Amino acid sequence: MTREQYILATQQNNLPRTENAQLYPVGIYGWRKRCLYFFVLLLLVTMIVNLAMTIWILKVMNFTVDGMGNLRVTKKGIRLEGISEFLLPLYVKEIHSRKDSPLVLQSDRNVTVNARNHMGQLTGQLTIGADAVEAQCKRFEVRASEDGRVLFSADEDEITIGAEKLKVTGTEGAVFGHSVETPHIRAEPSQDLRLESPTRSLIMEAPRGVQVSAAAGDFKATCRKELHLQSTEGEIFLNAETIKLGNLPTGSFSSSSPSSSSSRQTVYELCVCPNGKLYLSPAGVGSTCQSSSNICLWS
């Protein structure tokens, strides 16, 4: 024991002691103590609930090291499994589906795919709606999956169909508002080919000729008014075993022989008026064609 400690101990023992000394308690007592315990208990309960909610959210959302739920973060990008809903616009560079499943895009109203340039301007748009599918771009192309050749292309100047055959199955056929250029028009086997213009003219032109062929059927040309066959530099050639001209008018012929009018006429002579009109005249010993016939005079 040191000297200082000894002096302090002897001094404390020599101090007079009072019998009625008052003691003051040190600490938190009463309602303050109860409030402190209540807040500590409330904080503990909050921590437990918070921890339980965190564990429940991690369990429900399926948080892992690779991602969250159906969302997986890989080196190549983000991978989604199952059905995913996007409430806001989605900006991506490429969208791929799995090798064993298709890619399905679904919306309650429509599906719109936009393409923009580096300045943010809209360069192409594809909209799939409930009533129509609209494509807005400079050029629209449909290519074959095998060799990549263009099956259909459309732009402001022309529409090109690259398929081997264009088949129209509608009952009204194909309606063209303007001219059509094609090297070959044919119908399906055992079907009729019909070219019709209900309110205007139908014109077929070709610099090296127009050929109409019906190998196993008839060829009919019907019109309401006049049918013109015109050759400016050549000739009109009719070649068939039998050539029939029906509904030709019959001209009158005055004969001095009374027997010709009484007998039934079965043979007629084909006559031509100066204006080119054909008519029939009763055949006789000589020619019965007359330029003064009523057919030529009234034509």
Swiss-Prot record:
The entry's cellular-component GO terms read:
cytoskeleton; endoplasmic reticulum membrane; Golgi membrane; plasma membrane; sarcoglycan complex; sarcolemma
Localisation per UniProt entry: Cell membrane, Sarcolemma; Cytoplasm, Cytoskeleton
Q: Which cysteines are joined by disulfide bonds?
A: 273-289
Q: What residue intervals traverse the membrane?
A: 38-58
Which residue intervals are topologically Cytoplasmic? 1-37
Q: Which GO terms describe its biological process?
A: cardiac muscle tissue development; heart contraction; membrane organization; muscle cell cellular homeostasis; muscle cell development
Matching entries from InterPro entries are given as: Sarcoglycan (IPR006875), Sarcoglycan_gamma/delta/zeta (IPR039972)
**Sites carrying sugar chains:** 62, 110
Segments on the Extracellular side according to the record's topology features: 59-299
Give the bilayer topology.
Single-pass type II membrane protein
**Is Disulfide bond a UniProt keyword of this protein?**
yes
Coiled coil located at which positions? Answer: none
Domain of life (superkingdom): Eukaryota
Protein keywords:
Cell membrane, Cytoplasm, Cytoskeleton, Disulfide bond, Glycoprotein, Membrane, Signal-anchor, Transmembrane, Transmembrane helix
What is this protein's function?
Answer: Component of the sarcoglycan complex, a subcomplex of the dystrophin-glycoprotein complex which forms a link between the F-actin cytoskeleton and the extracellular matrix. May play a role in the maintenance of striated muscle membrane stability.
The record's similarity note reads:
Belongs to the sarcoglycan beta/delta/gamma/zeta family.
Q: What name is this protein filed under? A: Zeta-sarcoglycan
Q: Which organism is it from?
A: Homo sapiens (Human)
User: Gene that codes for this?
Assistant: SGCZ
